[in-house]
Regions:
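Structural preference for solvent-exposed beta-strand-turn elements
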Residues: 1-185
Length: 185
């Protein structure tokens, strides 16, 4: 449970024909952008659990989100209508921008399989923070993913289609778990 209530929210930003949804708990952040008909640009923060429960129950049709200056928000779809109180998005912690010129390309299936085959051997306690994640070691046209918990070690090597500048990063296990839930397959 987070102590900052804004971190339990989804930031909804409407502008110029797009709606951006952002969630961030300071450890894991996710963002998606969809097309939409915007009558007036604006930003609000909606309680993530309530918003998800509402959207999950809506029929597969167009959804309208309206809000006023006091952040009273009305969500409608066909005959369904929900009223909730949102928050100002001013206190929301935005995701850092990442330069996309330093990317490695692998298939979604491969990434999901690599995580599945290595995630079991990450440490589940915070005594050694570095062991609660996985090392992604890029060297030329090879990606090596390594995880260990002090008793077990998992190593998975993948041949990449392109050559890349050598780089090593540790990705938190929590992040990898969430990514693997999102990926198809």
């Amino acid at each position: 449970k987070t102590t900052m209530s804004i971190l339990e929210c989804i930031l909804v930003e409407a502008k110029e024909g797009t709606i951006k949804f952002t969630a961030n708990d300071m450890e894991l952040g996710i963002e998606t952008v969809i097309e939409g008909n915007i009558l007036e640009k604006g930003t609000i923060a909606l309680d993530a659990r309530i918003f998800l429960d509402i959207v999950r129950k809506l029929p597969d049709n167009d959804v309208t989100i309206e809000t006023d200056d006091s952040f009273k928000t009305i969500i409608t779809c066909e005959k369904a209508k929900f009223t909730i109180i949102a928050k100002s998005g001013e206190d929301f912690s935005y995701l850092p921008s990442i330069e996309k010129n330093d990317c490695v390309v692998i298939s979604q299936y491969t990434l999901k399989e690599v995580v599945r085959q290595t995630i079991f051997s990450i440490a589940d306690n915070d005594t050694n923070k570095i062991m609660t994640g996985e090392l992604f070691d890029i060297n030329g046209s090879e990606l090596k993913v390594v995880s260990l918990d002090g008793h077990r070690i998992s190593i998975r090597k993948i041949d990449l289609k392109n050559e890349y500048t050598p780089k090593k990063v540790i990705v938190p296990g929590k992040t990898l778990n969430e990514i693997s839930k999102i990926l198809p397959g």
